Amino acid sequence: MADARPRILYVSDLAYPARGRRYCDEDILLTSRLRAEFDLALCHPRDAAALMDAFDAVVVRNSGPVLGYRAEYDAFRERALRQGTRVYNPLTGRADMAGKQYLLDLSAAGLPVIPTVDRAEDLHRLPGADRYVVKPRLGADSIGLRIVTRAELPALADGTVLVQPHVDFAYEVSFCFVDDAFQYALYAPDPARRWELVPYEPTVRDLEFARRFIDWNGLRHGIQRVDACRAPDGGLLLVELEDLNPYLSLDALDEDRREAFVTAFAASLHRFLDDVPSR
C-alpha cells in the first residue's frame, strides 16, 4: 500500500483586490501543480486556525494584508506556536512577519536600508530631503502612506508611524528566494507603474546585497522577497523584506523560470516536512 501523501492547508484570499494584478491566479497555478505531490485544500486566512489541526502543515501564501484580519491572524499565530503546528513560512521570521521594527533596527545598524525613524527625537538621523514618506508601522500595500514636508514631521513622528526620506530612485527591483536559493529578479522600469514588472538580470553585487538580508533573517525554509530601490548614487537600498506572504508575480516570468520556481517550491515543502518534526 502506498504511503499517505502529506496534507497541506494552503491559505489564500482568492478574492483580495490588488491594483494591477490578480493574486488568485498565482495561487490557482501553484495549487494545481502542488496537487501532484500533496493532498491539498485551500482556505481563507480567517479560517486557518479552525482547520489547521487536520493537516500536516499550513502554507501561507497570498493571504492579503494582516491588517484586515488582525485578531484572526494573532489567534492563528498563537495557536500554531503553542501547538507546534508546521507553518510555511516558519513563524520565526524577523522581517515583515514580525512588523516593521526591523526597518528601524537595520537603519540604526547602518545597513543599506532607506533611512527610517519613528520618533521626533530621532528626526536628526534622517538625511535632508524635499519630501518625506510617513506610513503606519502596521500598514501594508501603501495603506495610510503620506508624503509630507520636513516641517510636518515633528507632529507626526509619535512612535506609531515610520518616517523615511522620499527617495528619487531610478527603479524598484525584487529578488525572490526559496529557502536560501535565489530564483529570479523582477523590476519596474517605470516608478509610476510599480506593479508592471519585467525580468531583471542581477549583477553579482545585486545578489550579494539581497543575500545579506536573507542571511540576516535566518529562515531555513520558505519563500522570501527582497524589495529594493536603485538610489541616485547607483547603490541599492532595502525597501522591505517580505517573509510572510510575498506576492511572486509569476505571470511576469517566462515558462522556464516559472517552472523552475514551481519545482523549487515543491522541493522546499518536502524538505520542510522532513526537517521540521510534527506535533
Indicate residue ranges for each PLM-predicted region.
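ATP-binding N-terminal substructure of ATP-dependent carboxylate-amine bond-forming enzymes
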Residues: 1-86, 274
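Flexible loop residues that form catalytic
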Residues: 13, 63, 121, 137, ...
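Short amphipathic alpha-helical segments and helix-helix/interface helices
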Residues: 27-31, 73-78, 103, 123-124, ...
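Short amphipathic alpha-helix with an adjacent loop that forms part of the alpha/beta core around
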Residues: 47-54, 78, 123-128, 152-155
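A short beta-strand motif that forms the metal-chelation/ATP-contact edge
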Residues: 55-60, 135, 175-177, 184, ...
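A conserved helix-loop-beta module that forms one wall/lid of the active-site cleft
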Residues: 74-147
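Phosphate-binding site of ATP-dependent enzymes
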Residues: 141-237
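C-terminal active-site "lid" helix and adjoining low-complexity regulatory extension at the edge
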Residues: 230-279
